[in-house]
């Protein structure tokens, strides 16, 4: 199969094959949970992946895939979300041949369970999997194979980060994940998060390394800040998390 999960050990794939076209990227927004969904495709093979689809906008995503003449191989989740129900189960029904993907450490059901170091191939491109736990134990960051862009889920947000006070979160673990798995990428690597609540769409590794008010702190100071956030519980957590544990392979009831 052209879209297979491969192990990459110490080598970097090229984003381009010869003079081939660059990766196709579309960033989409779901306003209720302020979630970004990302569509990436190979303009030559027409193979594509979706990152962090939302149930309420899965029909929109499927329509865009069809309009662009793409073949969706994977609906991928960066982690088991607490603020929305994933659209991956519905997309499997809407676009036959699509498979759901999530980290094995998430404990959620899916067609494919990935681990740190795995690569999701679509045409000439690949998304490298970097385990980035802390927000949840199963969080991963997906890095395009030329290291030009990273899809950080809730681990790293623009000038912020995911909370660590539920779903077995750990502030110290998150701090080390970001510094060791994301901040080690090139400074001009684009950062695309799973959420933004201020109208921002993209950042860079260098910006976040130098300007992120939480992650420029020491680890000890970061843990203290995270412990004092005292945020309200996500409105959808009580039904979103149970649903997301199985919606990788099931279409949610209407």
Swiss-Prot record:
<comment type="subunit">
    <text>Homodimer. Monomer. Interacts with TST. May interact with RELA.</text>
</comment>
<feature type="binding site">
    <location>
        <position position="154"/>
    </location>
    <ligand>
        <name>Fe cation</name>
    </ligand>
</feature>
<feature type="binding site">
    <location>
        <position position="79"/>
    </location>
    <ligand>
        <name>Fe cation</name>
    </ligand>
</feature>
<keyword id="KW-0809">Transit peptide</keyword>
<keyword id="KW-0496">Mitochondrion</keyword>
<keyword id="KW-0963">Cytoplasm</keyword>
<keyword id="KW-0007">Acetylation</keyword>
<keyword id="KW-0597">Phosphoprotein</keyword>
<keyword id="KW-0539">Nucleus</keyword>
<dbReference type="InterPro" id="IPR001279">
    <property type="entry name" value="Metallo-B-lactamas"/>
</dbReference>
<dbReference type="Pfam" id="PF00753">
    <property type="entry name" value="Lactamase_B"/>
</dbReference>
<keyword id="KW-0408">Iron</keyword>
<feature type="modified residue" description="N6-acetyllysine">
    <location>
        <position position="66"/>
    </location>
</feature>
<keyword id="KW-0479">Metal-binding</keyword>
<protein>
    <recommendedName>
        <fullName>Persulfide dioxygenase ETHE1, mitochondrial</fullName>
        <ecNumber>1.13.11.18</ecNumber>
    </recommendedName>
</protein>
<dbReference type="GO" id="GO:0005739">
    <property type="term" value="C:mitochondrion"/>
</dbReference>
<dbReference type="InterPro" id="IPR051682">
    <property type="entry name" value="Mito_Persulfide_Diox"/>
</dbReference>
<dbReference type="GO" id="GO:0070813">
    <property type="term" value="P:hydrogen sulfide metabolic process"/>
</dbReference>
<dbReference type="GO" id="GO:0006749">
    <property type="term" value="P:glutathione metabolic process"/>
</dbReference>
<feature type="modified residue" description="N6-acetyllysine; alternate">
    <location>
        <position position="32"/>
    </location>
</feature>
<feature type="modified residue" description="Phosphoserine">
    <location>
        <position position="14"/>
    </location>
</feature>
<keyword id="KW-0223">Dioxygenase</keyword>
<dbReference type="InterPro" id="IPR044528">
    <property type="entry name" value="POD-like_MBL-fold"/>
</dbReference>
<feature type="modified residue" description="Phosphoserine">
    <location>
        <position position="19"/>
    </location>
</feature>
<dbReference type="GO" id="GO:0050313">
    <property type="term" value="F:sulfur dioxygenase activity"/>
</dbReference>
<comment type="similarity">
    <text>Belongs to the metallo-beta-lactamase superfamily. Glyoxalase II family.</text>
</comment>
<feature type="binding site">
    <location>
        <position position="135"/>
    </location>
    <ligand>
        <name>Fe cation</name>
    </ligand>
</feature>
<dbReference type="GO" id="GO:0005759">
    <property type="term" value="C:mitochondrial matrix"/>
</dbReference>
<feature type="transit peptide" description="Mitochondrion">
    <location>
        <begin position="1"/>
        <end position="7"/>
    </location>
</feature>
<dbReference type="InterPro" id="IPR036866">
    <property type="entry name" value="RibonucZ/Hydroxyglut_hydro"/>
</dbReference>
<feature type="modified residue" description="N6-succinyllysine; alternate">
    <location>
        <position position="32"/>
    </location>
</feature>
<keyword id="KW-0560">Oxidoreductase</keyword>
<dbReference type="GO" id="GO:0005634">
    <property type="term" value="C:nucleus"/>
</dbReference>
<dbReference type="GO" id="GO:0005506">
    <property type="term" value="F:iron ion binding"/>
</dbReference>
<comment type="function">
    <text>Sulfur dioxygenase that plays an essential role in hydrogen sulfide catabolism in the mitochondrial matrix. Hydrogen sulfide (H(2)S) is first oxidized by SQRDL, giving rise to cysteine persulfide residues. ETHE1 consumes molecular oxygen to catalyze the oxidation of the persulfide, once it has been transferred to a thiophilic acceptor, such as glutathione (R-SSH).</text>
</comment>
